[in-house]
A protein has these predicted regions:
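AlphaC helix of the eukaryotic protein kinase fold
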Residues: 48-70
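Structural helix C-cap motif within protein kinase domains
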Residues: 210-214
Length: 324
């Protein structure tokens, strides 16, 4: 690993003692640190030297800090502090004890329908809250969603949030946003919106239950063209057991025309909630039975909710165990 701006045991701004290097990305290093004031472990994200030299990247980092710091929701990674150290901007986030959905997908291949619905319900809650506070995430994908050991999801990386006028393909085929999850209108140069976030949620839902994205190719331009021109694939081709109620939600999210998608995340969340309140409908052989036993739902609802929460906990623990 290349040299970083902070060393193990170094103390940033007389408060954050570096414990370990948690990871690194294209823009920043992420450190595990101990807050000497609160006596809690935190994550410190600091821009790379080459990244900090670029004014656009600095602006993005500042926007991420402002956007995320303005949000206080149980399903959003909380920003605790921001500052500058040795000339490099940093932000302090809550430390997430878990793994990204992408990491779990790489190990398990896909999630069960019940697990995926629970995750999507929580994600809709987070995005709905962000939208209500004027923040468009613009980079929703499994890599930016953490699953904690208690089954709670945490949405992070608001690095391009609210960059509503910069959604275009550049000359070097790069995009502001991840092209596999990018709504067709964004690649055509239109502004980001709640509906473009909903499109990305739908793509993520598809990936959770199939283990792959619906459109992929050799270049960003090719993939963007597929989102724009090609018919959305039949989900059951990749997972034949997909219940109609789940497929219907994904198809509505991923309509080419934003007007034909869910008007907001609350509508999508309500559809998912119907499934979670009666998870038997996820199994085709039980759907007819469950239709005639609706009176039992209120009595069994608490048990069912506990079951799908335990399923998520099991998924997180299994993924952690297999990575060791």
């Amino acid at each position: 690993m290349e040299d970083t701006q902070a060393a193990i045991n170094e103390i940033i701004d007389d408060r954050y003692k570096i414990v370990d290097i948690a990871g690194e990305g294209g823009m920043a290093f992420v450190y595990k640190a101990h807050d000497l004031v609160t006596d809690k472990d935190v994550a410190v994200k600091m821009l790379r030297p080459e990244t900090a030299a670029n004014k656009t990247n600095l602006y993005r980092f500042e926007r991420e800090a402002r956007a995320a710091a303005s949000l206080n929701h149980q399903n959003i990674v909380k920003v605790l502090n921001v500052g500058t150290y040795k000339g490099f901007p940093y932000m302090v986030n809550e430390l997430i004890n878990g793994q990204t959905l992408k990491q779990i997908l790489d190990i398990r291949g896909k999630f069960s329908f019940l697990e995926a619905c629970d995750i999507m319900y929580q994600l809709c809650s987070a995005i709905m809250y962000a939208h209500q506070h004027g923040v468009i995430h613009r980079d929703i994908k499994p890599q930016n969603i953490f699953l904690t050991q208690d089954g709670t999801i945490k949405l992070g990386d608001f690095g391009i949030a609210t960059f509503q006028n910069s959604a275009h393909i550049t000359q070097n085929n790069s995009m502001l946003g991840t092209v596999q999850y990018l709504a067709p209108e964004i690649s055509r140069g239109q502004n980001a919106s709640e509906q473009s976030d909903i499109y990305a949620i739908g793509i993520t839902f598809f990936e959770l239950i199939t283990g792959r994205v619906p459109f992929d190719g050799d270049t960003a331009l090719v993939i963007a063209a597929m989102h724009t021109k090609e018919k959305f694939p039949n989900i059951k081709k990749f997972n034949p057991r997909t219940p109609d109620c789940v497929a219907k939600i994904i198809y509505r999210c991923c309509q080419k025309d934003p007007v034909e998608r869910y008007p907001d995340c609350e509508y999508m969340r309500k559809d998912i909630e119907k499934i979670l309140k009666n998870p038997a409908i996820l199994e085709k052989n039980k759907s007819f039975f469950s239709f005639f036993h609706r009176d039992d739902q209120s009595r069994d609802q608490r048990r069912q909710e506990k079951e799908h929460r335990n399923a998520l906990k099991k998924a997180a623990k299994e993924a952690k165990k297999e990575r060791k």
